[in-house]
C-alpha cells in the first residue's frame, strides 16, 4: 500500500519548528499507516479473497562488537526499522514504540476510530527492499559508511560499492528469516540491486560481471532462506533499466540490465542497450531462479 514508509522527504524543515520535527515525522507516518489500513479493508471488501501487502525498507543492523552497549543500540535500530511493518501486520503500535514516544515527549494525534481502523486493515503479506546491511556502535569515532541515505557504522567484513553501500548477500537470507519468523506472512523482495559505473565498449557492448555476481549471490541466499522454510511469493530487482538514482540524483549510478544513453546532466540520446547482465537474468527468469551460472 505504501512504498518506503516513512522517508520524511515531504517534510519541509523551514515550516516545522526544530523541536517538533521528529513529532511531525511520526504524525505523518501515522496518517500513512491509517490510510494503508483503510485501503486494505476496502480492497478486501470490494474484492473478496484479494491479497494486499505492505512494503518495508529493510535495513538490517548488526552490532559492531559484542559489547552490551553496542547490542542495545543495535536492538533499538532494528526495532525502529521493523515497527512500520509491525503496525501493518498486527494492526496496532508496539508498546515499546508508544513508550519511546512518552520518553521523547512525542505526541501523535490519533483519532478515536484509528485503533479500530488499524486492526481492521492488517496486511496479507510483507514485501521489502533490500540493498545493504550496516552495523551500530556507541563509539562516536567508529567509521561510518559514506554516501548513504541512511548512515551506519562500516562493517569491516563486507565489500562496498563505489557509493559506499555494503554488499551483504547473506544479510538478505538473515533478513528474510527474521521477517518470516516475526510475522508468519508470505514475503516478497520488491527492490534489490546495486548501483555501479558501467563502461560502453567500442563495439557497444557493456560487460558488467559485478552486477551478475551481485544478483547471483543474493538470489542464491534467497533460495537458501526458502529451503529453511521462508514462504516467498516473489522477487523483483531495482531496476530493470537505468534510471536516475533517488539517493544521489545521478544517472551514472546505474542499476539496470538495460543501459540508457544519458549522463548526469541529462545529455544523451536515451538509446537503450542490453548489458551482459540482461542475458544472464533472462536465463534466471526462464529457469525460475534455478540457473544462476
Segments predicted by a language model, with ranges:
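Active-site region of glycoside hydrolase catalytic domains
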Residues: 1-293
Amino acid at each position: 500500500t505504501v512504498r518506503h514508509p516513512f522517508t520524511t522527504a515531504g517534510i519541509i524543515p523551514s515550516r516545522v519548528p526544530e523541536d517538533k520535527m521528529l513529532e511531525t515525522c511520526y504524525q505523518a507516518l501515522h496518517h500513512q499507516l491509517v490510510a494503508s489500513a483503510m485501503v486494505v479493508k476496502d480492497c478486501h471488501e470490494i474484492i473478496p479473497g484479494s491479497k494486499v501487502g505492505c512494503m518495508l525498507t529493510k535495513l538490517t543492523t548488526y552490532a559492531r562488537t559484542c559489547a552490551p552497549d553496542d547490542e542495545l543500540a543495535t536492538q533499538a535500530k532494528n526495532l525502529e526499522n521493523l515497527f512500520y511493518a509491525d503496525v501493518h501486520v498486527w494492526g496496532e503500535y508496539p508498546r515499546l514504540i508508544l513508550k519511546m514516544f512518552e520518553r521523547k515527549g512525542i505526541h501523535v494525534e490519533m483519532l478515536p476510530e484509528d485503533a479500530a481502523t488499524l486492526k481492521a486493515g492488517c496486511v496479507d503479506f510483507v514485501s521489502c527492499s533490500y540493498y545493504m546491511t550496516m552495523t551500530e556502535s556507541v563509539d562516536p569515532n567508529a567509521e561510518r559508511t559514506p554516501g548513504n541515505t541512511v548512515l551506519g557504522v562500516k562493517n569491516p567484513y563486507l565489500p562496498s560499492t563505489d557509493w559506499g553501500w555494503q554488499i551483504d548477500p547473506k544479510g538478505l537470507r538473515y533478513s528474510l528469516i527474521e521477517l518470516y519468523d516475526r510475522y508468519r506472512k508470505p514475503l516478497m523482495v520488491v527492490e534489490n540491486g546495486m548501483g555501479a559505473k558501467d563502461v560502453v565498449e567500442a563495439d557497444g557492448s557493456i560487460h558488467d560481471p559485478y552486477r551478475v555476481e551481485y544478483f547471483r549471490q543474493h538470489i542464491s541466499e534467497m533460495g537458501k532462506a526458502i529451503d529453511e522454510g521462508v514462504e516467498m511469493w516473489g522477487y523483483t530487482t531495482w531496476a530493470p533499466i537505468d534510471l536516475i538514482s533517488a539517493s544521489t540524483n545521478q544517472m551514472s549510478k546505474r542499476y539496470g540490465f538495460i543501459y540508457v544513453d544519458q549522463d548526469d546532466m541529462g545529455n544523451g540520446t536515451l538509446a537503450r542497450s542490453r548489458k551482459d547482465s540482461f542475458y544472464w537474468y533472462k536465463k534466471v527468469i526462464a529457469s525460475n531462479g534455478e540457473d544462476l551460472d
